[in-house]
Amino acid sequence: MDKLKKNLDEEKRAKILLYPNKNDYAKTSFINCDTPNANSDHCSVIIVSYKTGSILIECLQSVFLQKSIQQVILVDNGNSRTLMQQMNALADEEPRLEIITGNGNIGFAKACNLGVRRARSEFILLLNPDSIMEVDTIYKSLKVFHSKPNTSVITVKIENPDGSEQRGARRNLMTPWTCVVEQFRLDRLAPNHPYFKRLNLNEAKPLQHISRVQCISGAFMLMPRAVYNSLGGMDEQYFLHVEDVDFCMRIEKSGGIILFVPNIRVMHQKSSSDVYPGFIEWHKAKSFCTYFNKHFHMQYPKWILNIFATTIYFRFAVRLVPTSVSWFWKKIITGV
């Protein structure tokens, strides 16, 4: 790590890490917790990693370049021995890095809660292990918090490696109806009608100013630790996927405010873990059903929720064969 720090200055290295192929890129009162000190600039970063590749090293490089970082907590949910040897060596050199484990893959939500319990800073950042930040990302985000002290959670513009806004980075609240609208693109029937709002907003008109949104991605969630704890953290019913949507739903129900900051960017590579896709799709299907039963059992008759559950698992079954064949074929070709 020391050698890497000496090789490149901060601005140049951040630009290379973010966009290697681009030259031009480089109220918490609602939950009865105190507003963070306006002068607080300390943040604990929580990163949950499961079978993550070398992108984790790049992620950590971008984290350690940030101002305001007091602590980086890496939750090992089951990485390779080689990668963890590298992480342990890095922890010996970088005192801010703490490595903890739940002794196996305990799920994303539970791992986040485990990491937050170790956090010491007033602010916490939940960051995916395949995300790379520009210099001063956290510092600039904290300035937004200090200027808007009633904010519950902040996210930034999460981009794909090609610079496009990533799907799921900003969304409307997920309901059974918005899922139907999204799946069948019913918004095309009446594009401006509030009844036909799409779930994902990455194809909507780009936001130019800091804006309130209903739902964001768990790839980058910055908030006061008091907000996270007052909501009870992530719901551990969810093993993988949808826990971030559930968290946003609970913020919305509690009267909280989520802000999207479009002029701060983070690159999220996505799908960097070497995991059998059937495992991911199965837990995603279970999480969708958990979410709908948890939040909509009073609004929708049980038979409608059962239809949704049947549809979700049918979709899982249909997708299982092609995704599995593709994954195993890739393994054969690459010899991994």
What are these regions (language model features)?
Residues 61-70:
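Short, acidic, metal-binding catalytic loop of nucleotide-sugar glycosyltransferases
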Residues 62, 76-87, 104:
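A conserved acidic beta->alpha catalytic loop
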Residues 249-327:
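Active-site-adjacent helix/loop segment of glycosyltransferases
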